[in-house]
């Protein structure tokens, strides 16, 4: 006679949770490691960007001239794709990155307040001006398509883990930033909706 078969389902495999999202999927290599914040262009002439869809947080803030710039924050430094187009820092972006103990990636910076912030707060940064870790290059396809030079710089995200080791950058999160970056509700006990219906939403800047 044949052996009886078990009808029980296998136990699900739980991956580590991403501290920036509270969602499972963080690689084992990234547990307890620092996130990475990358400066990205956000003007019409530089669109479309690429690599930002993999970011866990996108920070958009005004810079001079009424335009905005993005800072993409990736919780898993081993899974960052190539990102384009990379732009320069303004002083408030590295301060936001610092609040997550993130490694800060940029290509250039304004030399007044930003330089003071870098020095005063000992920001861990990787800069395209010096092509730190050979992590920066120009997108030849964009150049061929007629994009302006400043809109063609990209960051070689897949090469970052090896470059961080080569550059001697700290990769472990400091003690103040261990665990989840936010207070997340347990997925098995979602919060009940409260409040009143919103008929109109208006956002100004």
Cite the ranges covered by each PLM segment.
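Gram-positive cell-envelope targeting signals
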Residues: 1-7
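A surface/extracellular/periplasmic glyco- and lipid-processing/surface-interacting theme
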Residues: 9-57, 64-205
């Amino acid at each position: 006679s044949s052996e009886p078969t078990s009808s029980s389902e296998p136990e699900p495999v739980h991956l580590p949770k991403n501290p920036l999202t509270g969602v499972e999927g963080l690689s084992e290599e990234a547990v307890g490691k620092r996130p990475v914040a990358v400066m990205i262009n956000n003007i019409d002439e530089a669109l479309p960007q690429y690599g930002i869809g993999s970011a866990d947080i996108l920070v958009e803030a005004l810079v001079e001239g009424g335009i905005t710039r993005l800072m993409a924050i990736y919780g898993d430094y081993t899974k960052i794709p190539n990102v384009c187009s990379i732009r320069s820092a303004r002083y408030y972006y590295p301060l936001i990155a610092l609040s997550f103990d993130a490694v800060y990636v940029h290509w250039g910076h304004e030399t007044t307040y930003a330089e003071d912030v870098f020095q005063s707060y000992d920001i861990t940064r990787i800069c395209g001006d010096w092509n730190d870790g050979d992590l920066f290059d120009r997108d030849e396809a964009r150049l061929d398509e007629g994009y302006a030079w400043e809109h063609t710089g990209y960051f070689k995200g897949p090469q970052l883990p090896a470059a961080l080791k080569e550059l001697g950058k700290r990769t472990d999160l400091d003690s103040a930033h261990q665990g989840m970056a936010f207070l997340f509700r347990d997925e098995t006990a979602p919060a009940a909706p409260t409040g009143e219906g919103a008929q109109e939403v208006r956002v100004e800047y």
